């Protein structure tokens, strides 16, 4: 991995359009996985509401760029001492090049700076790319919720 290939920065309101485009790509990609509608209900898209998200004291959004082009983002919500990555998405062309790892490292740094002691993350069942990203960052699954209609 070339550590200088990508840079991470705090999201700004001017990033709303880029976030919305990446979110659409994430939703399209996620349609193949179980639970996508539930996760969208629990972790709604943020692009259209970015100003409120950024002004909230318990959330932050980081952007990963390559040559000033947005390649991905992470949306994190803080509850007490726990930072939860509600959504992380890396554009297809930036995958397996270190963008996700660099973004997660920055998420950890920011979460620690904000007083968090633990980091959690959400991934859909079958989403091996996201699961593998988390595992490479030494984040292991600790809970699996199974369900059935009655």
Describe the residue ranges of each PLM region:
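Conserved beta-strand-loop-alpha-helix junction that forms the acyl-donor binding cleft
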Residues: 95, 121-130, 147-150
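Conserved acetyl-CoA-binding loop-helix of GNAT-fold acetyltransferases
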Residues: 90, 96-109, 132, 136
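Conserved GNAT acetyl-CoA-binding A-motif
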Residues: 111-123
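Conserved beta-hairpin
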Residues: 59-72
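Conserved GNAT-fold acetyl-CoA-binding loop/helix
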Residues: 24-49
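A short helix-loop-beta-strand connector motif used in the catalytic cores of GNAT acetyltransferases and
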Residues: 48-62, 84
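Conserved beta-strand in the GNAT
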Residues: 69-77, 84
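A short beta-loop-alpha structural element at the N-terminal edge
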Residues: 6-21
């Amino acid at each position: 991995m070339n550590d200088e290939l990508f840079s991470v920065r705090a999201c700004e309101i001017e990033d709303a359009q880029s976030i919305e485009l990446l979110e659409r790509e994430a939703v399209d990609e996620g349609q193949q996985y179980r639970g996508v509608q539930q996760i969208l209900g629990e972790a709604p898209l943020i692009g259209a509401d970015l100003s409120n998200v950024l002004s909230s004291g318990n959330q932050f959004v980081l952007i990963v760029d390559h040559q000033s082009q947005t390649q991905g983002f992470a949306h994190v919500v803080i509850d007490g001492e726990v930072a939860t990555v509600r959504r992380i998405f890396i554009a297809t062309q930036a995958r397996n090049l270190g963008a996700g790892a660099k973004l997660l490292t920055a998420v950890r740094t920011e979460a620690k700076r904000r007083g968090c002691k633990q980091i959690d993350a959400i991934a859909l069942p079958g989403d091996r790319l996201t699961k593998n990203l988390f595992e490479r960052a030494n984040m292991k699954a600790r809970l699996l919720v199974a369900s059935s209609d009655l």
